[in-house]
Amino acid sequence: MDFPILSAMIAVPLVAGIIVLFLNDNGARWTALLATLANFALGVVLWQAYEIGGDRWQFTEYVGLGEGTLVPAWALGIDGIALMLIMLSVFLMPICIGASWRAITRRVPEYMGAFLLMEALMVGVFAAQDLLLFYIFFEGGLIPMYLIIGIWGGAEKIKAAYKFFLYTLFGSVLMLVAMLYMILDAGTTSIPALMAYDFPAGVQWWLWLAFFASFAVKMPMWPVHTWLPDAHVQAPTAGSVILAGVLLKMGGYGFIRFSLPMFPEASADFVPLVFILSGIAVVYTSLVALVQRDMKKLIAYSSVAHMAFVTFGLFAFNRQGIEGGLIVMLSHGLVSGALFLCVGVVYDRLHTREIARYGGLADNMPGYAVLFLLFTMASIGLPGTSGFVGEFLALVGTYEMSSWAAIVATTGIILGAGYMLWLYWRMCYGTQKNADAAAMPDLSMREWWLLVPIAAVVMWMGIYPESFMAPMRDDVGHLLERIEPAQVHFDARPTEGTGVAAASVTDTATDHKGGAH
């Protein structure tokens, strides 16, 4: 394709974001909606034009001083993994605009401009093929989200916005230092070139830790997750949707694009650390979710637990784990976004997120109850929904690396069923304790239009996940070729027929490879 479609997908929301600043409230709303729908249409064209099994990097664009220079270049291109994450971004953004249609009445043009800027930066993160360009997009996303929380958030919005900004900024400074070292050492800012460059094993440790500091906060991983519940509670509904749906995925994307392929030996050495932190996150945040009174906080803590499945899968160093982690990222983006929309539906009517104020909503809001049930089941991982496919593959991959880690991860699924079903029961079943809640009308036509598309994709991914796996399969293969020579030292899986831990699954695989040569 000769048309610079990736540049267009960055330019459309960026230009529209400037235009809306000069319009009235309704003009800003309609312009933002049309711009995001146009970008989604471009995304569909991108997906249709993507050639599965073709070149590793497609739709490439380059404007710069030439290869080998140390100056940032406008270098764009995507593989299948980036394609799926871009599709997730452009799919959710029109829904966010629709969710804000009536909820936001103050400084509407600026609000719409912030979301459009966010969309441009998100596409840029996943499409960037220049290291410094990636950093600009990656950190630029802080600004609109900081404004969305700090201006249009709840009562403690300033505290939440500062916490969000400071946490993410700290990790980003370390990552920038590491990037500068990498550029000077390798002599290039090209991400594909750096993915094939072999940094010394000792240096890889420090570079890996610097990148980990940034990506772990973005995921977020325990114990640097404490900014997320506050950010979700204070953010407007659409802010929570895009935060959980896309921004958290930037951390997982960073592990896939940088940590694993650029520092494979260090990644292998730090597998025990990642598994321990992920195991704590699954159990601890699930237990914390069980005692929450605020709907948004409960879903926020569940997000930390679900993203732990991503890190389990990605660092399992096998195909099932990595593919599972990627599908969990996509599924969580859809399901968590939908759950926050469900919270927004009742909050717009009763203006409270306290679970105890609701009950028996299935009587007067049956349509809402059905869709809320679907997203609850998807969050739990019910077969036939998107949540099952990714979690199952991630667990299988984790078991191949460590049976004990897989057991811990499985407890997270059990606890997840506990807090999600308990939330649903308290919201939709039982007696109606509040006359105001009992009088709430069912979903409006606008709300149906927001939730039904997500429900359709959740079912599509659960019934036929191949549509989403196929574009990413070759890229997972490229990643495995890069990381397989690294030996993981994690003595945690019992050998068959004994209770003695095997030396390492990957050690054995490496020995077989050595014999084959």
Give the location of each predicted region.
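Transmembrane helix-loop-helix hairpins at membrane boundaries of multipass inner-membrane proteins
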Residues: M1-I5, I19-G113, T188-A196, G499-V500, ...
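N-terminal signal-anchor/start-transfer transmembrane helix
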Residues: A8-D25, A213, P220
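Alpha-helical transmembrane segments and their helix-start/interface "positive-inside/aromatic belt" motifs
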Residues: N26-L37, K159-L169, M365-A369, M445-L451
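Hydrophobic alpha-helical membrane-insertion segments
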Residues: L34-A49, T168-V177, T376-A378, I414, ...
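Hydrophobic transmembrane alpha-helices and their helix-loop junctions in integral membrane proteins
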Residues: I95-R102, A120-L132, M145-W422
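Cytoplasmic juxtamembrane regions at transmembrane-helix boundaries
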Residues: G98-A114, T237, G245, A437-R446
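Short phosphate-coordinating micro-motif centered on Lys-Gly-acidic
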Residues: E139
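Cytoplasmic/organellar membrane-interface segments at the starts of transmembrane helices
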Residues: M365-G367, L421-H517
